[in-house]
């Protein structure tokens, strides 16, 4: 009997360890995740957050709330190298997303955006910022609990896992390692679950001539596209 209990316990421990092991692709994709620091006009820090690159030229997605009222911003990669945020390419205050151009001296690592939306029950993984040579030790792992329409062909997702403090705006991936969303808190204040706004939607944003006097953009002192 004791032997059976021991075998069952050992099996449980092995399963738990396996379930908590980060997918192999995370070690590669972590290079595209950066920290963001925005500054006021007097040079003092306004906000800190997370962003991630979606092409090798330095296009980055992040949260609009991190940039609102900012006069300057920089990003820092896992190796401690900093780059200036050059331009705002598009923004949506309602859904708290922003698209930016970062000035980098060379091509950067970036995340592939999922071409297809996820459906209820599919696995979802969140990758926080991880420093250079560190392994991914903490990450979000769960399922898509609910899918709602955002705009046009874009979606908003409810996820089965709660967010840690430093996970806000981190990229959320499908099982293949393609990013499909930016992590967001539950607006109701509950901590049992989290949400993800479509990364494809954020990447579709652009600035038009009609936005010249739009407060969404005039509240940010960084150059617009």
Predicted regions and their residues:
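Catalytic-histidine neighborhood of serine endopeptidases
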Residues: 48, 55-107, 119-120, 188
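C-terminal cap/linker of serine protease catalytic domains
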Residues: 20-27, 108, 132, 179-225
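Sec-dependent N-terminal signal peptides
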Residues: 4-13
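A conserved glycine-rich beta-strand in the N-terminal activation segment of trypsin-fold
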Residues: 20-23, 38-57, 63, 81-84, ...
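Short conserved beta-strand and strand-loop elements enriched in small hydrophobics
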Residues: 36, 71-79, 124-129, 146
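Flexible, gly/ser-rich surface segments that form the specificity/activation loops bordering the active-site cleft
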Residues: 21-25, 108-156, 164-167, 183-194
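Terminal peptide-recognition signature
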Residues: 34-36, 51, 58-62, 85, ...
């Amino acid at each position: 009997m004791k032997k059976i209990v021991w075998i069952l316990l050992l099996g449980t421990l092995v399963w738990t360890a396996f379930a908590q092991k980060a997918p192999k692709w995370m070690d590669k994709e972590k290079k595209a995740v950066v920290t963001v620091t925005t500054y006021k006009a007097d040079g003092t820090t306004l906000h800190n957050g997370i962003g991630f690159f979606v092409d090798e030229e330095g296009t980055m997605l992040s949260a609009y709330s991190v940039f609102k009222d900012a006069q300057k911003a920089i990003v820092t990669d896992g190796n401690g190298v900093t780059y200036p945020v050059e331009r705002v390419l598009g923004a949506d205050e309602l859904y708290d997303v922003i698209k930016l151009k970062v000035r980098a001296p060379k091509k950067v690592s970036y995340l592939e955006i999922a071409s297809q939306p996820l459906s209820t029950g599919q696995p979802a993984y969140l990758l926080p910022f991880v420093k250079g040579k560190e392994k991914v030790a903490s990450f979000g792992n769960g399922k898509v609990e609910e899918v709602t329409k955002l705009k046009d062909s874009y979606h908003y997702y409810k996820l089965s896992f709660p967010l840690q403090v430093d996970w806000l705006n981190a990229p959320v991936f499908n099982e293949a390692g393609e990013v499909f969303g930016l992590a967001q808190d539950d607006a109701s204040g509950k901590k049992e679950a989290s949400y993800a706004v479509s990364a494809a939607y954020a990447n579709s944003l652009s600035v038009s001539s009609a936005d010249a006097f739009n407060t969404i953009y005039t509240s940010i002192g960084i150059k617009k596209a």
